[in-house]
Amino acid sequence: MPAYPQAIHLHPTAELAERVLLPGDPGRALALAQTLISEPRMFNHHRGLWGYTGPACADGEPLTIQATGMGGPSAAIVLHELICLGVSRAIRVGTCGALRPDLGLGDLIIARESIGADGTSRALGADQRIAADPALAEALLRAARAQVGDYTRCVHSGAVVSVDLFYDDSRAPPHPADALAVEMEAASLFAVGVAASLPVACVLAVTDTFDAAGSRRRIDDHALLIAAEAMGAVAVTALSA
């Protein structure tokens, strides 16, 4: 860990749980807290990085849900400070764009590894391919497959690619052929986890697909809410395993 053993950007107002969910979107952190935590208390409000904590509805054990903001630099800062505060395992619950035609809107992806096409994971000295914690990723896959009958969407497992740009352009290099989807934070979070010997994993919902001509199809708000709730339930189950 770098030489800042205290939290500078997170100002906790409640006790941190040892297990943490990491959505990027502060609004999704609130929505997940309202669904997954009984009587959630605000954990952090500073910098607009909303976080919530309390007993999980599923098992009564402490759970914290902390937004990371967008992109690898912000995500790395948040996880670093959570480690300083005592987190023991973390799961990113986020969104992604499909890179394969067999993926549909609302499908869930368990990221076994992230291919770092970003600056943050490289700055952290990580290899280009950074693995999720194997045991936590396997727990996510089991939980997702057990729930798929209720959720009625497909579950996929494999590599994703993490990038710095959301609005890509022709100067960006082509994505690796084995990547299922593209997102922005997993490589940085995995890199921080590896450096700190912290189990970190990632479950993603597909929110964008692209046809052969490159036209984007975007998930609607209701379907996104359902997908986020599914991801949250899967992640809590995995953290309880």
Regions found by a protein language model. Give the residues of each.
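A C-terminal functional module that forms or caps the active site or interfaces directly
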Residues: 171-210, 215
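N-terminal short beta-loop-beta anion/metal-coordinating cradle
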Residues: 1-76, 229-230
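Non-transmembrane, aqueous-exposed alpha-helical and coiled segments at domain scale
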Residues: 48-51, 61-63, 70, 75-85, ...
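Active-site rim beta-loop-alpha module in soluble metabolic enzymes
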Residues: 127-178
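Acidic/polar active-site rim loop that often engages polyanionic ligands
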Residues: 111-128
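Alpha-helix C-terminal capping segments
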Residues: 57, 83-86, 98-104, 191-199
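His/Asp/Glu-rich mid-to-C-terminal helical/loop segments that flank catalytic regions of hydrolases
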Residues: 213-241
